[in-house]
């Protein structure tokens, strides 16, 4: 049907007779000669239709609409010098059409223009509702091809390293290991339910017990959770697990993998080794376990400096066990007015959205003088001023922004403000090579975190992470005192402030696994009922093992320079977990519900009000 791709023609194609297929991107009538930009996934080429050289082709071309599907027969020739187009890879040539066949017409009105010239002005809702049209666009086509190259590069690397691709079940049982499950009723086993996997975590551990030793999978995963720009209810992980390797070996191998992907997909040699930072340092310096290290404005703790001052917001925070922290904003004096920092201002609103009551601020003037207002001004001694300048490294023109209160809220608020100001002040310049890819390993996560609402400890990652036994101690009777400081042998790979992947060494001792499950609130009987298959497997000579999973959607988003993973997935859901194109999820017939032995108690709120 076709001999060449539209985007494949170059100067060395001149005089070749070709047959092309594609969509009409644009049509231009120049008074006697018609020009058609014909597009397929390889690119776009100009078709010239001259009535003197192809009357029938010209008659067809006179009535063509955008997105009509064509087959064009013609001869490649050089473009005249005045019509060369250096914006197109095919811009040095054109095809003189001798025959045009309409393969399919557009019979209705297009919901939006598909041409690359009009891409930027279409609402996302329309794009998702008519995704089949959106996929014709160069941007989306390029993103999906980049996604395919990313997965291919990962597969090549892992196969060369002796890994085996193994598929794990999609229909499994619900286990209390993380977010809310998607569940499916069983028709055959009435009253019982399957769950879609949130990850292949337990199955990949069982593969290690089974002697596979090196496993990987491009795995589909499902989580029924609130969505945002970089989350979907169904998503893809590059899942990896290996036996007889320590944490250092696992980190090195996965660095090699990431470097291989970036080299293959972007042609970039990433600097090695990736920097490392403990979880504690990340929280202390950035207020988050996913720090963006492309710019400064690190959090600085100043609780000891201000704890005795008369400003009760500061002193009260310290006395109640909280913190006072500050970020130094270079050039902030000129860039940020008082109005923006006070209630109602955009910077204040960012802190408030993270749970903070507000922000205090100090301006460093020329000569190092400190300028502030209100209670801070009246209660800050010269010694405290000098110590603040010394600790923050503030220079003239710097704005100091303070957060005070519960440490977790202070961290969250200043982290959010820091990220917001980095964009506002253009501190991130991704066009510069050294700013584009800041990888960071975050290590030594806490094993447990305390849930004050339920008055119990929970696993920070999941209860299958191997704890640092030096922290916990060998006697579980001592754990009551060691739990708060116990570290997990866990690690996350962060890229430009986003978590790219994470993993850990796993518990491979059944007694330790039982104890950890008990610690997070699962009695022995319940632990056996929920995870007995895993615990029994650990009793059968489980090897030491560990692994990691990368978020493929997020990785491709970063490689493509997109802001949302929806632009790297062929058919994504909205933030309400709906598919606008197919109108899924949808209701099902009552007969289907009866076959599944279930009934719906859902009441439409709108109908209920009536």
Swiss-Prot record:
GO terms for cellular component: cytoplasm. Gene3D superfamilies: Bira Bifunctional Protein, Domain 2 (3.30.930.10), GAD-like domain (3.30.1360.30), Nucleic acid-binding proteins (2.40.50.140). The record marks 30 as: Important for tRNA non-discrimination. CDD domains: AspRS_core, EcAspRS_like_N. InterPro entries: Aa-tRNA-synt_II, aa-tRNA-synth_II, aa-tRNA-synth_II/BPL/LPL, Asp-tRNA-ligase_1, Asp-tRNA-ligase_1_N, Asp/Asn-tRNA-synth_IIb, AspRS_core, GAD-like_sf. Residues 201-204 are annotated as: Aspartate. The keyword ATP-binding applies. PROSITE patterns: AA_TRNA_LIGASE_II. ATP binds at residues 223-225, 232, 499, 551-554. Keywords: Aminoacyl-tRNA synthetase, ATP-binding, Cytoplasm, Ligase, Nucleotide-binding, Protein biosynthesis. It is an enzyme of class 6 (ligase). GO terms for biological process: aspartyl-tRNA aminoacylation. It is found in: Cytoplasm. Homodimer. NCBIfam families: aspS_bact, PRK00476.1. PANTHER family: ASPARTATE--TRNA LIGASE, MITOCHONDRIAL, ASPARTYL/LYSYL-TRNA SYNTHETASE. This is Aspartate--tRNA(Asp/Asn) ligase. The gene is aspS.
């Amino acid at each position: 049907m076709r001999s060449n791709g539209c985007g494949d023609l170059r100067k060395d194609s001149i005089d070749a007779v070709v047959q092309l297929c594609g969509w009409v991107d644009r049509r231009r009538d120049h008074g006697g000669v018609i020009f058609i930009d014909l597009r397929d996934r390889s690119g776009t080429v100009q078709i010239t239709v001259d009535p003197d050289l192809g009357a029938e082709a010209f008659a067809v071309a006179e009535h063509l609409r955008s997105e009509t599907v064509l087959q064009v027969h013609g001869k490649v020739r050089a473009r005249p010098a005045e019509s060369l187009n250096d914006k197109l890879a095919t811009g040095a040539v054109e095809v003189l059409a001798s025959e045009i066949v309409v393969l399919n017409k557009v019979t209705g009105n297009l919901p939006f223009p598909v041409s690359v010239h009009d891409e930027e002005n279409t609402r996302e809702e329309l794009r998702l509702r008519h995704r089949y049209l959106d996929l014709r666009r160069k941007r989306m086509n390029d993103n999906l091809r980049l996604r395919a190259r990313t997965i291919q590069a990962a597969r090549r690397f892992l196969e060369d390293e002796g890994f085996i691709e193994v598929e794990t079940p999609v229909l499994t049982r619900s286990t209390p290991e993380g977010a809310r499950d998607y569940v499916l009723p069983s028709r055959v086993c009435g009253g019982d339910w399957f769950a879609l996997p949130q990850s292949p975590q337990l199955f990949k551990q069982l593969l290690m017990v089974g002697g596979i030793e090196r496993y990987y999978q491009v795995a589909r995963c499902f989580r029924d959770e609130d969505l945002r720009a970089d989350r979907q209810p169904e998503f893809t992980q590059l899942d990896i697990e290996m036996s007889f390797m320590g944490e250092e070996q696992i980190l090195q191998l996965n660095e090699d993998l990431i470097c291989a992907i970036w080299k293959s997909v972007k042609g970039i040699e990433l600097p090695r080794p990736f920097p490392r930072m403990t979880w504690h340092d990340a929280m202390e310096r950035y207020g988050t376990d996913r720090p963006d290290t492309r710019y400064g404005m690190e959090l600085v703790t100043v609780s000891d400096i201000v704890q005795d001052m008369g400003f009760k917001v500061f002193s009260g925070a310290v006395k109640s066990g909280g913190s006072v922290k500050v970020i130094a904003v270079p050039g902030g004096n000129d860039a940020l007015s008082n109005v923006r920092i006070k209630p109602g201002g955009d910077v204040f609103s960012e802190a408030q959205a993270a749970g903070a009551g507000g922000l205090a601020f100090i301006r460093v003037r020329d000569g190092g003088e400190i300028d502030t207002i209100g209670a801070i001004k009246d209660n800050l001694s010269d010694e405290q001023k000098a110590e603040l300048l010394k600790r923050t490294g503030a220079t003239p023109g710097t704005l100091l922004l303070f957060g005070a209160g519960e440490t977790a809220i202070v961290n969250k608020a200043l982290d959010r403000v820091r990220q917001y100001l980095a964009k506002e002040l253009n501190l991130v310049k991704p066009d510069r090579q050294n700013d584009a890819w800041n990888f960071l390993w975050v290590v030594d996560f806490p094993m447990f975190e305390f849930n004050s609402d339920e008055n119990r400890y929970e696993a920070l990652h999941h209860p299958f992470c191997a704890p640092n036994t030096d922290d916990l101690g060998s006697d579980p009777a001592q754990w009551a005192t060691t739990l708060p400081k116990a570290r997990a042998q866990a690690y996350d790979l962060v890229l430009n402030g986003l978590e790219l992947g994470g993993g850990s060494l796993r518990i491979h001792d059944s007694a330790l696994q039982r104890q950890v499950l008990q610690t997070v609130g699962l009695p022995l009987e319940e632990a056996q009922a929920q995870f007995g298959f895993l615990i029994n497997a650990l009793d059968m000579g489980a090897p030491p093992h560990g692994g990691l999973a990368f978020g493929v959607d997020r990785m491709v988003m970063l490689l493509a320079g997109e802001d949302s993973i929806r632009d790297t997935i062929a058919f994504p859901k909205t933030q309400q977990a709906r598919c606008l194109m197919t109108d899924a999820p949808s209701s099902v017939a009552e007969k289907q519900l009866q076959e599944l032995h279930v009934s719906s108690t859902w009441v439409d709120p709108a109908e209920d009000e009536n």
